[in-house]
Structure formats: C-alpha cells, structure tokens
A protein has these predicted regions:
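A conserved regulatory-domain signal marking ACT and ACT-like small-molecule sensing domains
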Residues: 1-122
Length: 122
C-alpha cells in the first residue's frame, strides 16, 4: 500500500529542494507530488512506497509530516476520459474522493472515504 504524506511548510524558496535532496540521499523515490501555496504556507502531498523510512527522513530534514494515509494508486490509460470513467464508478457507488493527483507513469492517486469499497470498484 502506498502512503500519501502531507506537510505544511512556510512558503519559502528551497522547501521542495530540501525534500528532494533528503529523499534522494536516503534512496527514497518520490513517486508523486502535489504542492501549492497560499497565505504564507504551502501544502505538499508526497507519494512514497516505504512509509516508515520516508517519515524518518522527512522528519530529520525538518519537514513536519502532519498526516499520512493509505491511497489507491491506479495505472490508467493516457487518454481522454480515463480518469473520468474511474471517478464515475466511485461516485456511482457513493465513494467520495477526498484527494486526487496524477503521479509518474499515468498513475492516478486517490484518497477516498472508503478505501476497501473503492478497491473492489476499480
């Protein structure tokens, strides 16, 4: 199971460099990332495989992980409508998507309110 980590750094130059350098030096592959800023803060979601190791490395780099959750990581076709079809199946089954972003290799990362039910649908 892949983990999505969330940290909320100050909005300043070098935060993502520090993240990438710390992960790289520790041999951690960042498989996906979503980052945005507002009101002086950033919100960064990072997709990793080795959750425990990544948590230790991010903490040592001064990146305070605020949340971690299991996420679905789906290989999807790189074509129009592929994401919509998956999201429609979940919606029709009343599974709420709470977070979504694309990761490397046309993979869709979804955090949902019922991960077990979602697994059976996708």
């Amino acid at each position: 199971m892949r983990k999505d980590f969330v940290f909320i750094p100050d909005d300043q130059p070098g935060v993502l460099a520090r993240l990438g350098e710390a992960a790289g030096a520790a041999g951690i592959n960042i498989e996906g990332i979503s980052a945005f800023t507002g009101e002086g803060k950033g919100v960064v979601h990072v997709l990793v495989g080795d959750a425990q190791h990544a948590l230790e490395v991010l903490s040592e780099a001064g990146l305070d992980v605020r949340a971690a959750r299991d996420v679905l990581v789906l290989d999807i076709a790189d074509e129009p409508g592929a994401m919509g079809a998956i999201c429609r199946r979940l919606a029709d089954a009343a599974v709420n998507i709470e977070q979504a972003y694309l990761a490397t290799g046309s993979r869709l990362v979804l955090a949902v309110d019922d991960i077990e039910k979602a697994r059976t649908l996708v």
